[in-house]
Amino acid sequence: MKADAKTEAAVLAAMNKFTAAYQQRDIEGLMGILSPDEDIFLFGTGIDEKRTGPDEFRFQAERDWAQTETLAFSLAWHKISAAGSVAWVAAEGLGKGKAGGQEFEFPMRMTAVLEQRGDKWLLAQFQISLPAPGQEEGNSVPV
């Protein structure tokens, strides 16, 4: 169900806090937005990026930062739904960064599940993906 305005604003604020901490390479700020539970989960864009638990999430963020000079995400569109203390987000936007002295940008898609604990919304599951290269608009598969 569509989130009410108060929930949508709180969840969007949590997502913005997450992207700001990531862009600023603030590991403690980033970890403070995650659920502390060992079953939090992340799918990244790399073939090996399947992470479970806070320690693996931390490892992934630190690896991302070690391989880039800058890396940021901006969300251009989002849809937020909720039921009780659980909210789920679908969003798309643009990733931008610099690695090896070369600037890059890419369209990205993201889904997330957040849980409200007290007055905070915490990320429990997160997935980021890239539209399939070579798949033209209107086609269901990239061939």
Predicted regions and their residues:
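Short, well-ordered beta-strand segments in beta-rich or mixed alpha/beta enzyme
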Residues: 30, 43-45, 87-97
